[in-house]
Amino acid sequence: MSAKILASTENMAYEDWLEYRKQGIGGSDASVVCGINRYKSPVELWMEKTGQLLAQEAGEAAYWGTQLEALVRAEFTKRTGIEVKIVSQLLQSEEHPFMLANLDGACGYMYIGDFDPLTHI
């Protein structure tokens, strides 16, 4: 599967990032779409994506997940010897444009931006 860069997130304001996320379904939305998320219903997600409901502020787990991203990348590299690169782009599937990805990090054979399209997400 290949993806294109929808937007750079490097210096993007949080509010702008939330607006971009309305354009599709990301990893955090997948469990909601499947009906297995106990915190949000598919109808609530649809209402958020269509601007009929304000997105809820991220909870404690999401906060700590974001805070610990750099630590997890560093520990993975320490244990495996594989470098993890920061990906400061919001990616969109070329085959299924509703699919979005905002990666915490990437390693291996990933080419983004001026190179070949991202492959094998």
Model-derived segments and spans:
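Active-site beta-strand-loop-beta-strand hairpin of nuclease catalytic cores
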Residues: 106-121
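Short, glycine/acidic-rich beta->alpha junctions
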Residues: 68, 97-98
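Acidic-basic catalytic patches of nuclease active cores, encompassing PD-(D/E)XK
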Residues: 62-85
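Coil-to-beta-strand transition motifs
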Residues: 98-100, 118
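Short, flexible loop/turn elements at secondary-structure junctions
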Residues: 60, 68, 90-91, 107-111
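A short acidic/basic microdomain associated with nuclease active sites
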Residues: 77-97, 104-106
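Active-site-proximal segments of catalytic enzyme domains
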Residues: 72, 103, 109
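Charged, glycine-rich intrinsically disordered N-terminal tails and low-complexity linkers that flank
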Residues: 1-67
